[in-house]
């Protein structure tokens, strides 16, 4: 072997020239400690807040949340048992993002946008978007003026929800909160079957900390009723790590924003944000952030406000798209003055209160119409609904007041008795079975019959039968009236024909 002196001296010179340079360890760090889904890592000097990192030895990813002077606190998206002290951690150089686009419709994904429904990879992804972005400012927005039809009479008549609104659904466990949300998704089948893209309403259902069986049941219901085709389900079940439960609403929101920013309409349901707050509290306490009220961190209000502010109605210059948010909050023993409920009530544009007592009295959906409110109000209703439902709120309020007095006195005058009878029938009329949302023209006819006195002579127990037979009669004999209400969105031109149809039906009903 021939060794040339010149080569050796060149190698030695280069070694000497490079001697003493610092090795750059900014993109690779090592684990100092790990436990409870949190890793403390040394050496990731240039990592950004919210950046993805990878643990190559364990094959899991994480997100940098705490950037401290001598270490970085990382939350782990997965099982931390395979991670050991001293393991290598690599920066991925990207903030957490998810795939967005119409290719996700009909799919069930995890909070990182990976499919978990066994139907193979997601096709035709439009782009990838960061999960946590700034909400639109004041200038790109427009006031809410188009309705989101939930298909539930109690909501569409009294607490109307508009496209771009944030309407909270709040109540104890087992009061039908998810049922209201699922019915809203099912009711969009008719508009999504049409060809008018400006009327379609795509749906995103985000399940946070739910049982897997519950999520599977909801997906099955949507699939059986043909609603999964226009719905994305984002699932972070109770068995998933807290960081994924915390991330799920943001991932779903990024998917919804793609529709909003491309001139389409979407509604997103967060079921429920109480569990997201609990997951965030767990992460924050493990990261040693200082606790505040009810041990939640100080920025839990900001967590929910920055999420819900992303629901918006955009103006003409920005494509007229909208994202409507229906967050769900679970209360304990009807206590709406707890920390998270009061926070979310103050962020949203109204709330739908569901009550256990009403639920067990058989009033379902169990909406307490007295304290539920929509701050957008009748600007989110079509003209026909305003005309039909105008008197109903006042009549129900008077009914509740008189019903409270009627408990004490037996000798009631005729006007009071009439008011009580009308209120009972209207309350009965607002009942509705699950998975049977009504089209807006059917609701207009039902509510018009109730508020204009056509139910006053019907026994309360017969109101449900009267309504179903009335709608069958209208479809059979007066489909033209229903079509006109649906297309013209106004009662004026058909009101006289509707009155005579109702009078004829009321006379024949027995």
UniProtKB/Swiss-Prot annotation:
Enzyme class per UniProt: translocase
Membrane topology of the entry: Peripheral membrane protein
Keywords linked to the UniProt accession: ATP synthesis, ATP-binding, Cell inner membrane, Cell membrane, CF(1), Hydrogen ion transport, Ion transport, Membrane, Nucleotide-binding, Translocase, Transport
GO-annotated molecular function: ADP binding; ATP binding; proton-transporting ATP synthase activity, rotational mechanism
Positions contributing to ATP binding: 171-178
Family the entry assigns: Belongs to the ATPase alpha/beta chains family.
Oligomer and partners: F-type ATPases have 2 components, CF(1) - the catalytic core - and CF(0) - the membrane proton channel. CF(1) has five subunits: alpha(3), beta(3), gamma(1), delta(1), epsilon(1). CF(0) has three main subunits: a(1), b(2) and c(9-12). The alpha and beta chains form an alternating ring which encloses part of the gamma chain. CF(1) is attached to CF(0) by a central stalk formed by the gamma and epsilon chains, while a peripheral stalk is formed by the delta and b chains.
Official protein name in the record: ATP synthase subunit alpha
Source organism of the structure: Phenylobacterium zucineum (strain HLK1)
């Amino acid at each position: 072997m021939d060794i040339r002196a010149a080569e050796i001296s060149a190698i030695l010179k280069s070694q000497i020239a490079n001697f003493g340079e610092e090795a750059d360890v900014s993109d690779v760090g090592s684990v100092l400690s790990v436990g409870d889904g949190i890793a403390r890592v040394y050496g990731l000097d240039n990592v950004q807040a919210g950046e993805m990192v990878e643990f190559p030895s364990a094959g899991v990813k994480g997100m940098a949340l705490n950037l401290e002077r001598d270490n970085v606190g990382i939350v782990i998206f997965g099982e931390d048992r395979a991670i050991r002290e001293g393991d290598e951690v690599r920066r991925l150089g990207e903030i957490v993002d998810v795939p967005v686009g119409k290719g996700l419709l009909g799919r069930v994904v995890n909070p990182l946008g990976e499919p978990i429904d066994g139907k193979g990879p997601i096709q035709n992804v439009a782009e990838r978007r960061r999960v946590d972005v700034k909400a639109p400012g004041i200038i790109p927005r427009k006031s809410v003026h188009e309705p989101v039809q939930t298909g539930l009479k109690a909501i569409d008549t009294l607490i109307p929800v508009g496209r771009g609104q944030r309407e909270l659904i709040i109540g104890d466990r087992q009061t039908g909160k998810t049922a209201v949300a699922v019915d809203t998704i099912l009711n969009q089948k008719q508009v999504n079957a049409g060809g008018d893209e400006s009327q379609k309403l795509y749906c995103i259902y985000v399940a946070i900390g739910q049982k897997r069986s519950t999520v599977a049941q909801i997906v099955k219901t949507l699939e059986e009723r043909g609603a999964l085709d226009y719905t994305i389900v984002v699932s972070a079940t109770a068995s998933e790590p807290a960081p994924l439960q915390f991330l799920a609403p943001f991932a779903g929101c990024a998917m919804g924003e793609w529709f909003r920013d491309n001139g389409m309409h979407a509604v997103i349901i967060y079921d429920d944000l109480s569990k997201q707050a609990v997951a965030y509290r767990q992460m924050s306490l493990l990261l040693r952030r200082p606790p505040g009220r009810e041990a939640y961190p100080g920025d839990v209000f900001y967590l929910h406000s920055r999420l819900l502010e992303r629901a918006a109605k955009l103006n003409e210059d920005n494509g007229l798209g909208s994202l409507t948010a229906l967050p769900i909050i679970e209360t304990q023993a009807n206590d709406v003055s707890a920390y998270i409920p009061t926070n979310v009530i103050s962020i949203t544009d109204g709330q739908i209160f569901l009550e256990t007592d009403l639920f067990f009295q058989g009033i379902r959906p169990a909406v307490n119409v007295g304290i539920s409110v929509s701050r957008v109000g009748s600007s989110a209703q079509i003209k026909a609904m305003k005309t039909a439902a105008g008197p109903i709120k006042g009549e129900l309020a008077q009914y509740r007041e008189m019903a409270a007095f009627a408990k004490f006195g037996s000798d009631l005058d005729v006007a009071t008795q009439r008011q009580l009878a009308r209120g009972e029938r209207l309350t009965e009329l607002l009942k509705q079975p699950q998975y049977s949302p009504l089209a807006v023209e059917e609701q207009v006819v039902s509510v018009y019959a109730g508020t204009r006195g056509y139910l006053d002579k019907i026994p309360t127990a017969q109101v449900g039968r009267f309504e179903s037979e009335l709608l069958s009669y209208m479809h059979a004999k007066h489909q033209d009236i229903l079509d006109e209400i649906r297309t013209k969105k106004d009662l004026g031109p058909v009101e006289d024909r509707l009155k005579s149809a109702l009078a004829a039906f009321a006379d024949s009903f027995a």
